């Protein structure tokens, strides 16, 4: 008989979060879905499912996060799978973005993820089991003009995930950073992503086409979010999940291209880069 798992999914009101919640419920699991506003919208979208508990919280507010996790535990007694999905994109040249715009992006995409993870981990550690699935991005492996700042938050998610995995795997908790390519969610809708208010003319040739192309691409992305949700379901039930999972042909192609470029740069500069050690000194290494 299948063991009923309990999921906690942030940003569950739409996009990936909604589809993952729907897939988990269809598989017979329970879901704590968190939303920033309009909790009744998620309840209605999932047809008042008896195994759904909706909690309103803002991931940037640590007190709200702690309270929401406690509510979820009180309802279903445990959490088995955390999906850190809440986040948003920002299209801008790096110089164009103000300090406030950058900090807001990091508050949600990075510090919000950390807030939720800190709130859930004590319960996972207590049971010596569980999964942490962090939704990253293809831009967490490589970036294009206009997506550099957003990509930097996803590079952070990849690094945090790798560090968490090293610390949590010995405790029986698996961590995976999932980097999707472009999927037909509302990520590229003008209601979802943010554009910096300042536009600098010098970046028109590089960022301009990205800025104008986002609207044209919206709704025409190659990935199916329902199929993505099935991948997450499979991942959550895999005995030995990967640390990094790129999802979508575009994400894989982008990562492979970046890896090849990096390998070429390492080779081209190898003699220079390895010429910096002290002469005749044996030093310790942090690399196991």
Predicted regions and their residues:
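Conserved glycine-rich cofactor-binding loop
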Residues: 13-15
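Conserved glycine-rich Rossmann-like NAD(P)H-binding loop of the short-chain dehydrogenase/reductase
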Residues: 27-43
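The beta1-alpha1 cofactor-binding region of Rossmann-like NAD(H)/NADP(H)-dependent oxidoreductases
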Residues: 57-67, 99
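Substrate-binding pocket helix/loop in short-chain dehydrogenase/reductase
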Residues: 93-94, 101-103
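Active-site helix of classical SDR
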Residues: 117, 153
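Residue(s) in the substrate-gating loop at a strand-loop-helix junction
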Residues: 137
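C-terminal beta-strand-loop-alpha-helix "lid" module of Rossmann-like NAD(P)-dependent dehydrogenases
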Residues: 169-218
């Amino acid at each position: 008989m299948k063991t009923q798992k309990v999921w906690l999914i942030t940003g569950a009101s739409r996009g990936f979060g909604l589809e993952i919640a729907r897939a988990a419920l269809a598989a017979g699991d329970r879901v704590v879905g968190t939303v920033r506003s309009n909790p009744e919208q998620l309840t209605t979208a999932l047809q008042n499912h008896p195994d759904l508990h909706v909690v309103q919280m803002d991931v940037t507010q640590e007190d709200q996060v702690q309270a929401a996790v406690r509510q979820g535990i009180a309802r279903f007694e445990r959490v088995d799978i955390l999906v850190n999905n809440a986040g948003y994109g920002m299209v801008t040249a790096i110089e164009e973005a103000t300090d406030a715009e950058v900090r807001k992006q990091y508050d949600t995409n990075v510090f919000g993820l950390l807030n939720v993870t800190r709130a859930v981990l004590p319960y996972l550690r207590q049971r010596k089991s569980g999964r942490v699935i962090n939704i990253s991005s293809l831009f967490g492996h490589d970036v294009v003009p206009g997506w550099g700042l957003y990509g930097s938050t996803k590079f952070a998610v990849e690094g945090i995930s790798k560090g968490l995995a090293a610390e949590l795997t010995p405790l029986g908790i698996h961590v995976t950073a999932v980097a999707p390519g472009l999927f037909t969610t509302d990520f590229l809708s003008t209601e979802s992503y943010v554009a910096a208010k300042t536009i600098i003319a010098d970046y028109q040739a590089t960022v301009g086409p990205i800025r104008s192309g986002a609207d044209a691409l919206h709704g025409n992305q190659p990935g199916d979010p329902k199929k993505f949700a099935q991948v997450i379901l499979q991942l959550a039930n895999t005995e030995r999940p990967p640390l990094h999972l790129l999802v979508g042909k575009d994400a894989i192609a982008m990562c492979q291209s970046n890896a090849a470029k990096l390998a070429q740069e390492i080779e081209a500069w190898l003699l220079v880069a390895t010429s910096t050690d002290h002469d005749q000194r044996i030093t310790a290494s942090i690399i196991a």
